[in-house]
Every structure is written in C-alpha cells, then in structure tokens.
Amino acid sequence: MVNLRTYGRAPFGVAVIHGGPGAAGQMAPVARELARDMGVLEPLQTKRSVEGQIEELKTVLEASAELPAILVGFSWGAWLSYLCAAYHPGLVRKLIL
C-alpha cells in the first residue's frame, strides 16, 4: 500500500494515526519506539473528506493489521481514531488518544 509505512515485524497490532490533516510522518518517532516491542502500522491520510479518511483507515486496518488493533491517535488522528472505532468497533481493541 502506498499510504502505509510499517515498523517492526508482523503481526501489526498497533496503528499510529497522525495529526493534521496533512502531517504525514508526524507519528514516525512514536512508531519507531513502539516497534522495539511490536509491529506498528503508520497509515498516511490521503483522502480529503472525513468519511474518506475513516474508510481509508478501515481499509488499511483490514488489509494489514492484526485485528482488533490498538489505535494511537494524536490531534486530528485522535479524532479520526475515535470515529473509526465508533463506526467500526470490531476493528479496534483499544484507543490511546
């Protein structure tokens, strides 16, 4: 996937969700630190609407994460993580906002 960076090794049970929108890569330091102990995904937001970003995150999680996953969201990414969990509760085990 073009809109995804991975850190560590599978299984990828954690996804770090950046702020912005438009701050792709912002969560890379967090992802690198967490990857010492677990596989981490860093989805990069490319859609322009909130609905599009929720569906994009859903698609990334379904394709690449060990579900249900832990979402670590910062700023805009915290809100997006919360919305993803609300719309797709089966995909999310925990939220860290």
Label the predicted regions.
Residues V2-V50:
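Conserved HGGG/HGGXW glycine-rich cap/lid loop of the alpha/beta-hydrolase fold
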Residues A28, I54, A86:
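Short alpha-helix within the catalytic core of nucleotide-sugar-dependent glycosyltransferases
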Residues P29, E56, L80:
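Short Gly/charged-rich anion-binding patches and loops
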Residues A35-M38, S64-A65, H88:
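A structural signal for short coil/turn segments at secondary-structure junctions
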Residues L41-V72, W76:
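Active-site loop/oxyanion-hole signature of alpha/beta-hydrolase fold enzymes
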Residues L67-L97:
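Conserved hydrolase catalytic core segment
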